Amino acid sequence: MPRAAAPPVQPAVPPKPIVTTTVIITHPACLQHEMGPDHPECPDRLTAIHDQLIASGLDPHLARREAPPATPEQLARVHDRRYVAAIQAAAPSSGLRYLDPDTALNPHSVDAALHAAGAVVHAVDLVCGGLYQTAFCAVRPPGHHACRARAMGFCIFNNVAVAARHALEAHGLERVAVI
């Protein structure tokens, strides 16, 4: 007597589709900030992130959002208003203008810095609003060394502090951990 075909094996728990829980926030202006041909803080940093997301297979599983520029009010939570105005006025029409030995502006740098700071504010809003569990800001110039009234260490605005202050003041959080 012929054997009946075995029924297909069903997994105990059906696999769940990958749900987009992470958003990447960036802006094309961040690729325009350049501090010279041999400077380590360069557009290739963002290109490398993009390339690795594709190579790893993660890219299709991530949401993408374009960063808005930070507002003067958002920056003023962390930076002296005179400093913000001075940075905006310091952008050269061509070439580079150095703010410190490590940090320079080109004609596109202020726009890039405003969008980098705006990205972190947008990330806080998206995560605190429950739209995503996590956010990654692929932006430059970086923003963790800048002081209240001074650029430093490749950083024009302190994006990390801008994000933390925004979380505290706009979303009513009591504490923020910066890791």
Range-by-range predicted roles:
Residues 2-4, 11-179:
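HDAC/HDAC-like amidohydrolase catalytic core signature
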